[in-house]
């Protein structure tokens, strides 16, 4: 299996979507039946307009006592116009939030992981231009850590020793156990030892790297990989 380094490799392409006219009840059905936490709202042309989340739909129940005049102590006197709008909404166009967190198919997995953690969101919608082409969630990124040790070893051999460092395969060895890579053997230059560790750690699914490599010459060789 080739290294999956971009969103396009791991995203879910078959996305459950709603239209602006989708009813409240149908939205609830989508979330409950399909076991998703949010439904994107798209135009007839496929452009992403907004998203309806579980929290948006719960607004109706959360403020039911206020609507009935029961004086619910948790919400009475604290309702905003936005609260009332969502509590009374009957279609996706009035329920949805327009503030969206998005990415592109070409974004790298580390970039997406940073967006998810920084913004505290569960998912990012994937856009090609303005069109929705997929969704990437936290679990999609975590799934890369389920790659087998043998798959990871082959990936490290190829991307680190063959493609990047052009090392003699008789002088280097990568072994993997529970996602942790052990690098042993000898490279030509000191700088290549650090490069091997950095590149191995960048392979999707690698949990950690133990570097036990040696070198022949100090310093940086003429073909040392930069960056």
Where are the language model's segments positioned?
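N-terminal targeting leaders
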Residues: 1-37, 42-47, 51-227
């Amino acid at each position: 299996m080739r290294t999956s380094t971009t969103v396009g490799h791991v995203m879910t392409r078959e996305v459950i979507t709603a239209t602006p006219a989708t009813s409240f009840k149908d939205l609830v059905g989508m979330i409950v039946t399909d076991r998703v936490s949010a439904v994107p709202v798209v135009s007839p042309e496929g452009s992403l307009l907004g998203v309806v989340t579980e929290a948006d739909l719960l607004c109706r129940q959360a403020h039911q006592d206020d609507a009935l005049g029961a004086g619910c102590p948790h919400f009475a006197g604290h309702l905003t116009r936005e609260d009332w709008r969502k509590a009374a909404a009957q279609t996706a166009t009035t329920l949805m939030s327009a503030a969206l967190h998005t990415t592109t198919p070409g974004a790298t997995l580390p970039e997406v992981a940073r967006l998810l953690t920084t913004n505290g969101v569960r998912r990012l919608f994937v856009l090609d231009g303005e069109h929705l082409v997929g969704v990437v969630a936290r679990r999609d990124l975590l799934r890369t850590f389920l790659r087998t040790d043998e798959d990871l070893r082959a990936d490290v051999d190829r991307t680190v020793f063959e493609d990047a460092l052009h090392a003699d395969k008789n002088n280097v060895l990568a072994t993997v156990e529970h996602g942790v890579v052990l690098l042993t053997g000898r490279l030509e230059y000191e700088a290549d030892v650090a490069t091997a560790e950095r590149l191995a750690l960048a392979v999707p699914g690698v949990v950690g790297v133990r570097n036990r490599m040696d070198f022949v010459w100090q310093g940086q060789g003429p073909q040392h990989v930069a960056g």
